Amino acid sequence: MGNMKVYEALARQLRADSIRCSTIAGSGHPTSSLSAADLMAVLLAGHLRYDWSEPKNPANDHLIFSKGHASPLNYALFRAAGAITDQELMTFRKRGSRLEGHPTPVVPWVDVATGSLGQGLPIAVGIALAGKRVLGAPYHVWTLTGDSELAEGSIWEGLDHAGHERLANFTAIFDVNRLGQHGPTELEWNLDVYAARAKAFGCEPIVIDGHDVAAIDEALARARHADGPTVIVAKTVKGKGVSFLEDKEGWHGKALDEEQARRALAEIGDVPSRTFPTLKPDPWQPPKRPAPRMPEWKTYREPLATRKAYGEALAALGAARADVVVLDGEVSNSTHAEDFKKTAADRFFEMYIAEQQMVAAAVGMQVVGLIPFASTFAAFMTRAFDFVRMAAISRASIRLCGSHAGVSIGEDGPSQMALEDLAMMRAVHGSTVLYPCDANQTARLVGLMAEYGGISYLRTTREKTPILYTDRLEEFRVGGSRIVRGGAPDDAVAVVAAGITVHEAIKAADEVRGKIKVRVIDAYSVKPIDTVALVDAARATGGRLCVVEDHWIQGGLGDAVLAALAEAGVAREIERFVHLAVRDMPGSGKPAELLDAAGISARHIVNAVRELAGSGRGGHR
């Protein structure tokens, strides 16, 4: 048992500091911080094993504030541990401060950005999963979870997976303070229901009074030594420690003014400013991995689906690198991510039909130095978009693959067709968006993704596609493109395509060969796009451009091309621009039928090329 007086003193300091920093900021969530102060005081002073001077120590425990709005408490913890000064704490929410309104890894003791509720817990599951199955690490993963976010389905995806994997190194602490943003939460203080739900998902519930430091101490010790995942269900009071805030509605997200803060601090009592001793982890280093080597890529000669090439490239990576992990959403026999199991079965993670948890786990795994690839149908990746968005704020490096893109998937129909994914992924800050057209290109791009930081997205195709690139030494780069037809200074028309439509564009160019000189650009790097190649094509053809894509007309390749030309200052040089894209809701049919019905087949490209080649100065369509 720890020192109860130390816990109580630390809790008072955490409460006082949460109020002080938010009052000076003039905004923040002090009442949400006050409810969890006792929980975090006992964790910090008695159970968290963390070397604050070395945040990258691989043996450190991990603490994630899933209720990221309680950032005043998070930063008060850092101050109590001696990681930051009181002076820095008072810069909370100010321009240029590391202490942003919700935690981000700009602060070195923060693993991931939180603040979009329902995300911290499933990311913590990913960190725990990596620690157990890949690293064999001694760390424990703790996450502070608010009761309002327990309405999020992603929380239960996370607990389901924690239970399924028997993650004894994972503990969720439910701060059940009864009040949400504008009123009571769904279950208020019905702790039995929370406990029953946790148990149903395979986690051991521990129900406590969240303001009884002795009970908290005992619960945390029990969680540390449990043989499976634990959920501490703590009954707390929002605004605890300040009488005019306790269990009162209308205070969420409101800082106290100076007079209110003086009254509150007087109630909290004497708080000597101090740094509290904390536990350090025992020395530990992960087992040495073999040095990464160049993967042995296959060279394909016969038509092959890019989704199949993706799987075989993962297998090559798995043999060459011990830090690569692969996650899939129960469609690995379609995405072909299952091929990774041929070389690294112990680093393949079946995430089932839980796309949010899949992306969250990938974010968690990269926290501890792994290189995650996560795949599902591109249409279903949209379900995890907020996790991708937050991953960018986390400065995370994750690699996503969306298969079965566009109308070219055929008979399965529009529910399975990703027609929004390029727009979605282009919009993510700092993202890389790649769309290969053949198997050899796919393998090389997968290799690039393994080396590239940030969020990268690979769009793959269901149908087999012809092989265009057969040179074993062929190189591709992020931000590059290839001219696959034409390329002369007197080309009449340029057709820009990516993925499946590259082959339709080639058919069209071959059909008009000898009559119209067509330059076909394989824009495999949709973001960043090859602006130099586009400008050269625009000028060579007198500004006659056609973009063809298997995607809705909004937000995809066409918009990327126009934006690049506009930013390069050559938009006025465009004589005529034709954008062939999916405009009407598709149905079922053969891939070739659907490409034609959508107006993006070779036949439609031929018509566009002829129109462009014979056009005078005109507009856009």
Predicted segments with their positions:
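Thiamine diphosphate
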Residues: 1-142, 207, 262, 272-459, ...
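Residue-level marker for buried hydrophobic side chains located in beta-strands
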Residues: 143-144, 172-175, 401, 435, ...
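Short beta-strand/turn micro-motifs composed of small residues
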Residues: 145-146, 174, 328, 376, ...
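A short helix-loop-beta submotif of the ANL/AMP-binding
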Residues: 147, 232, 371
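Alpha-helical transition-metal enzyme core signature, strongest for iron centers
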Residues: 148, 391, 546
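Active-site glycine- and acidic-residue-rich loops that bind
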Residues: 148-155, 210-217, 380, 436-443, ...
